[in-house]
Each structure stands twice: as C-alpha cells, then as structure tokens.
C-alpha cells in the first residue's frame, strides 16, 4: 500500500520478522476506516508496520478513543468544590471530611460476559478494582448493574447464573464487600447481556497519585501477572498467521485470578503510600499499549519499551501479541531508576514480579523495540489525541415515538388486588436476595447498610462519617423517552442515597447503547446524556468519569438504552443512617412528595397489561432536590425510623417492601394506610401503581411526626399522613376511594423472596440451547 | 499484658477486621507474616478469614504449610489459644489442629448472610463470657463451610461437648435457612478437647462494633481479653 | 449394558490456570521442585446405560458438549470402562 | 526422564457429593436420564522428572498424601504416562 501524501517520514520502524505486510485487507481487519488510515499515513509519513497498525487499531478503537461520544460527554458538568479529580484519570475522586477522599468508577464488561459469563464478569470486577487502587485508594465497596433476557429461556438463566457467580467469586476472594446493585430482565438483552461493575475506594487525599509518566530516564516496570495470548482482539482479528499456528480455537478468553489481584492490590498501595513510584496504571483494555501510551501522553513525554523484556506465559510471543494482550492482573509502573530494587523487594514480599521493560524519553515518541529491533515508532501525543472524532446523525426512531403515544389495551379484568402479587413475582421487582447472598457484603467490617434496601452504606473506618453508594437506571423509561429517562436515572440514584440520610456528592456513569452509527441509537445517546447533565447540574453532583459501551446489539436489534448511574453520597454521621424497612409497630407512615398518577412506562403496564409504552412522568428536578434536602435534614435530627423510595411498581410496591422487612427478620409488619384523600382526581390504579418520581415512603415515631411535618413544610415537600405500622406478621391494608385492599404480609414475602430462586432451580442447565 | 497475633497469609482479607475487633476490647494486637517463623511472643493467635493462596486446590490446604504454621502448631501444643475464623477454621482442619474438614456448601453457591447460632460450649478461650445456650446472630460468608467428619469423630465431638456453635433451626415463618451449608449436626464451630483451639465459620469480628448493628460478635473478643495463661500467671497476676 | 465413564475436563492450553500455578508453587515449596506444568481441572465419573461401548462414549460426549465442559474454556477427555 | 502423570482426586464414597448430585439432576433435565452415580472430583495433571516410571509414581503418591488429596475426605488414583 502506498501513501498518497508526500509528507516526510517522521519516524522509522521495521517489520518484525515473519510479520504480514500491511495491505488494505489487513487495515480493514483492524477496524480502521479510510479516513483513519489516511490520518495514520499522514502522521507517520510512511506505511505503518503491522505492530504499529495494531497499536493504532487499539488506541483508535471506540473503547479507547471515545470517537463517537467525546463531544457529547464534554457537555457533562464536571466541576464542583468537592471534585479532586474529574474525568480523564482511571477513576474520579471526590473530597470527604478530615483529609479523606473517595475514588470511584464504573465499567462495562458486556461482550466478554456474553461469550463466557463467569470469566467475563469476574475480569470485569478485576478491571474496575484496579482502576480504583491505581489511584492510591483502597477498594471498600463494589456494586454491579446487570441486564439479561427473560428467565424463562435457559440460555438467559445460564448467563445470569454464570455472571453472578463470576462477580461474586472475584470480589469475595479479593475481600471487597458488595454493597448494592441492580438486575433487570427484558427481551432486548437476550443476545447481549449487560454487566457493569462499579468500585468505590477510600484514600487520604494526600496519597492521590495520577497516571502520568514524568522524568526522562525513569524506568517503566511491568508488575504482576505474566503476559499471555489472552484477548488479543478476538473480534477484529482473523489473522491467518495466528490460526495457522494454533491448533483448534485460540484462547481469547481472559481468565481472572483474584488471588493475584489481591496481592497486586496490597503491593500497589504499598508502593504508592511509601512514595517509591512516580506513576502507576493498570493494563486494562488494549493492555500494555494503552497504559504506556496514555501515561506518556498525560506526562507530555515519550516512552521506549522493549517487548523482549516483558515476562510472558508462553514462548515465542510477538511484539504485536505482547502489546495487545489483555492478560489480567498487571500494572505498569514508572519509577526513578535507583528505586527499582526497593520496588522489587516490595513486590517480592507479595509474591509478585516487577520487571523493568523500558524508560521515559524526551523525544515524545512511543517507541517499541524487541531485543534491539525498533518495531514501532509513533509520535505519542498524536497517537493518543489524533483519532478522528465523529458527530453522528441523530434522529428519533419511529417506533419509539409511536410507543410513547400508544395507549394500553386494558385486560378483560383489572385486578388491582392481584396486580401487587404479580408485580412482586416479576424478577424485575422481586427481591434480588438470590443474587446478593452470593456476594460477601460484610467483609471489611464496615457495612452499615448492606444490599436489600435503598443505597448501601459503609463507615469510613476510624471516623464518624460514612458513604452511601448506589447504581440505578430504569431502562424502560430511557427507551421511551431518553431525555426524561436520563434525568430519571440520576434522580433515582440520588433518591436512594437520600433515603439513607446521606447527601449526594457525584456520579460515575456507564453508558450502554447500541450502534452509534444508527441515527436512532445516537439520538438515544445524546438525549439521555442531556438528561443526565441537566439532573447532575440540578443536584450539584458532577460527573467524575465513566465508560461508554456502544455496539450492544442482539440479533433482534439494539438493547434498551441503559445509562447506568453510579452515585456516592456522604452521610455525616453513620449513627443517623435510615434503613428502608418498617421496624416498630405503632409508628406513623408518612408519604413524602406528590402523586399525579403517571403510568407511562410503568411496571404495572408492563407486567400486568403486557404493554411497554406511554409517556414516562416528567422528572421534576426541583422537587427531587427539595426531597433530598428534607431527607438529609430529617435523618440528621433523628426524625425518621425508615425511608424507602417509590420507583418501579409505585406506592403499592414501596409500601409492601417497607412492610415485608428484610429477608432475615422472622416476619414483616402489618401496615394500614389510607390513600383516599391523598391525590385528588387520580384513579385508584394510578395512585397504587403510578411511577411519579420524588416520592418516599417513611415511618416515624409518633413523637416525631409533628417535627417531620413542619420540616417538610419548610422544604416545600408535600406530606400525607397515611397510616400506621401494625403488628408483626399482620396484613397490608390500603384504603382508597371507599375500597379496601388487603394482603397477608407472609404471603407477599413468600412471593417476593422466592420469585427468582423458583426460576433458578437448575441454573446451569442448557448452556447452549436458545443461544 | 496480653498480646494477640493475627496471622496474614497471602490472600487473607479479614486480617484487619480481626485486628480491629481485638483492639476494640483493649487488647494489643499485631500482624504476623506467614513467612515468619515465630509468633513474636504473642499469647493468643488468630487465623483470620479470607482466601489464603486463593483457596486454590482446597481451602486452607496450601496455607497450612506456611512457615508460620509450625509456630502455631507449637503454640497450640503448649496450650496457647488459637482462634480460626472461616478460612482460619479451614486451615486449622487442614493442619489437623481440629478434626474434620470443611467442604463445598451443600447448595454449591457462596453464601453471605446473617445466621442464628447457639453458643453451646462456653469453656473455651473465646466463649467464656457467654451464657450456655445463648442465641447470636452472626454473618457467614463462605463457599466451603460444610463441616464433615467421620461418624466416630462426630460422636466424640458431641460426647465431649466440643461443639462451640450450632446453627439454629428455622421457624415456619422465617425464610432464614437454619444451616447455610449442610454441615453435619448443624455444626458452625468446634474446639479441641481443652477449649484452647477454636474454629468458627461465622464471622464475629464483623459484628463487634455497636455502630454497625447489634454487636453479637463482641463476646468472642471480651472472652479472649479475659483469658489468662493457666499456670504462669499465678506469680504475676494481672490487675 | 452399563458403562462406567471417566471424564477429565481440563482448562484449555494457553489459558491461564491460576489453580495449577498455585499448586505448582506449593509443591515446589514442599520439596517437590521436580513437578512442573501442573494443571488442575475437574474429574467426573458416571454410569451410563448404553447398548455398546461406542454408544456410551457418544452419549457422554453429548453430555460434555452440553453440560459437563465449557466449550469456550475447557477441553475434555473420556475413558469408557465396563461397570 | 520426564513423566506425565494424571491424578484423579475423588470424594470418598459415602460422603455427600452435592456437585455430583447437581450434575446428575441437570443431566436428567437435559434429556440424559441414562446417566447415574455421578461423582465430581478434581483432575490434576503434571510433569515429574524421575529415573523410572515407578519412581515417578512414588513421587506423585507423596505429593498426593501431603497436599493434593485430603486424607479425611478424598481418595486418589494415578496414571503415569511418558511425556
Ligand atoms: N446485582 C446486585 N448486586 C447486589 N445487590 C443487588 C443487586 N441487584 C439488586 N440488589 C439490591 O437489592 C435491593 C433492591 O434493588 P432494586 O430493586 O434495584 O432497588 P431500587 O429500586 O431501590 O434501586 C437493593 O438494595 C440493591 O442494592
Ligand atoms: Mg430504591
């Protein structure tokens, strides 16, 4: 292939012996289009070597370059007095009291999990832990957001079971408690499950370390596991050379080793806090290539690596393979040369190797040698920054608009009584106990509120304050109305945080969408991001980082747009935390917030009417904000015995959940509530099952009710004194419009807590069927 | 002054939790590295939970050969107290400091939840402050917690009253499963004949802080703090 | 007829085998430095009713493909004996 | 000489084998009701340097007794091949 530009050769590099020549076909295999390849030729002034092509293809992939999403992401609010580190690093960092800071980040591992659910999910957790401890933070919580096709299909059960086991085994072994998550099921995820993992870590702000290479002559060290031929662009490469050499199928699956991760975690934190190193970054997607090139670009320096020095698991690996391997549990470290021995001593104590593989240079070139032969030499800053950025067309899909304006067919009989049982039996609303019991939620002995309520809460050891953490997204709302759905995801996360008594601080996001080159998908993306940005501005919760996962498509089309919001909040005094369940007979039940009866996109229509459509209730950001402030203030004064937000399934489900109690109490509580005078002119079904935002079900000791009511008045939040918490094991009685609905709490508990286990009796059967 | 050694194996992850629980009752604690060959004069040893050596092969099988374990063996043989929690219990069984073995949970999945247990034996270094028969709610979090032993070993453990903790049967209403892992005789913890070596599957160190909830685990550590060496203290009584 | 079949399911070559690594390490520390290339997998033993040894083997192969082995990460080997 | 040794470590007969039961259940649900007496254990494969096949076997027996099998709950079986 020849270059049409007559530019001077910028750098020189030779093909590695045996390497294929770079032809048009090879360029296409590397997922680079004409514009992109043209830019490579221009930037090098010559044809790249295969190794260089591999490097470009990795760094200019969607995953590393954000080429379809960058302009949209730049509209997010990222500043605030609490922000220590915004987007652009391995994790965002927010300031906490007393010199503490929190680092957190969310990441997707959707495609690896679709191929191999156990390892895909496990390595997803591994990657996100590294992103956090590489900032100098000790991971103190993980969360996960999962989506699968319906559980009546065996393949979906297999994926669900494998993913949950993978998430659990990895986090459990490393010893990080899982404090929350979410799981949803919808047909659109059948061929393409979503696996998003979030990690939250604590650090002293003074220990923060950024992944920027500095200091010409400083050494690069490869720390941790050996490099194998794992995950070398499984999808984009069908390299003839590789398939000739390999017997059957190439090992593309990355296998996680949580034990090595735990050692790497301890070694890394020791290296960082002892000041032995200049910078550290994990080798995640695109492995050594992206970690070294990005660290160099951030530091405005060049790097030179000798792939011949990288410890490998197999003999005969080429520079191409070593650069692009995604073997897990590896770190790239930059350090002053005289520190190398000390670093190796620390690593050896943790049974890890630390091998010098290169150094920082002053010429700005990303240079790779293999035992002396220069196989790649690319201007480093341009390698990282010059990928073409696209502004795809955006147009709302016809069917989305049609679905939003459609009206449901009312079933022959609307059974308002039975609807609650149906809803609690839906895997979407039922207890996720089957999932979170497989996750250690109490290791580190700091868990104040574990999974099963609203947000999780942990105590910051040695202090009085705590962190509240949650992940949320109602994908149905986003599918029907991406802008309102984006707002709703942030609002729900903030409400979950606020229910515990905490104040929302900031978010990380995992934007799971289909193919951005489809206008209807890009429309969803742009609008959902606009909603997220508006909500974050209204709540003063800046975006500190995140992850974009495009091309989530199954044979049936794109997945539901799923912008998962991971949020952290600060609970000033852990002792003030508010649980989500009723706890004391005789307490008064108060509903905070107004009900207008929005049923668009509701679980009621979906599960009972079998209808996904309608216009979701618009999110009132000001009302949400007032409610958040009220909750924090009421919790701080000890006025609340419980608080639980109404989301999927509306007030009826929220009241039932509060009454049922957690899975480990002997029994739930009865509850009597009168919703009659609550919402004038709203039909009964919409009061019970409507999904307006900004509403919370609370309980309070009778002696605190007056104070709570007047506090709500000060915050402009409507209050409805609905009824009382009853005796253990009683019934849930809801009165409205002269009608009385009664459910036995014991019966509801049986439905709610067994819905998923009943469907997962033989989880591992039929891996292949229905794929 | 009493001191406690918390042994850290590569892969231990409840080591800090155990240390903090010991310090909470005012007892000095220090970490001892698995490569150490001495316990640095500690009076009491804790083998904490976690995944020593990744729990690869069998839980506790590789850790049992760590250099420090010889010192632990000697300490136990001399009548020194040793508490193994979760992975520590598994290591004690692999090292034959306690009988039996801990196998994959009967339900096959990892189980993390609170369980109700009864304290049956209080004549141990770690349960002396409890009333016999008291019920506690403690968290479990394990994949390999099914206690098994040969028939005659089980009989011996029961006859000698060496069952320290037993899972409580469920009630009709409660969905709480009684025995989270299928252990023989619902055994959650056992001791050696003299009550100095104790292994527990539940994690008392995670519920020793009143700020986190009902501190049902605290008694194990106040018992530890009250322990005195049987003979040598006669000459130097503690205040 | 009934056949006793032994199945060995092993991690595919080239894939990381952390268990094998850990065992190799431990063996070496225990005074067996002469052990190498350790890999750890699953051993499954079952009885299968079949007309012939060939049919028994074919049957167990199906079981392996469908359930016993993970086609993405594992290889398997059979041994059929009479029972 | 180097020998390739296959070790099978199986749960001792009489002990509950929940994994084996689960696999048997799953097989039956998948249309293999003809499988029975399923047991699941560990397969370990290793190279060992030794003067003779007998020495190799003796060596691996030691490894099993010391580490690879739990004498309280497991039995093991060896097969030695050339490598
Ligand atoms: N994948 C999961 N991992 C851990 N916890 C989960 C998971 N899915 C759900 N949970 C927990 O179950 C509870 C209910 O979840 P969900 O119905 O999504 O709550 P909400 O509607 O309040 O966000 C929460 O405490 C949540 O953290
Ligand atoms: Mg909630």
Feature map (PLM): residue ranges:
Chain B
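N-terminal beta1-alpha1 cap of cysteine-dependent amidohydrolase-like domains
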Residues: 1-84, 93-99, 103-110, 118, ...
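Glycine-rich nucleotide phosphate-binding loop and flanking beta-alpha elements
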Residues: 52-53, 89-91, 147, 171
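Amide-donor transfer/coupling interface in amidating biosynthetic enzymes
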Residues: 73-77, 105-239
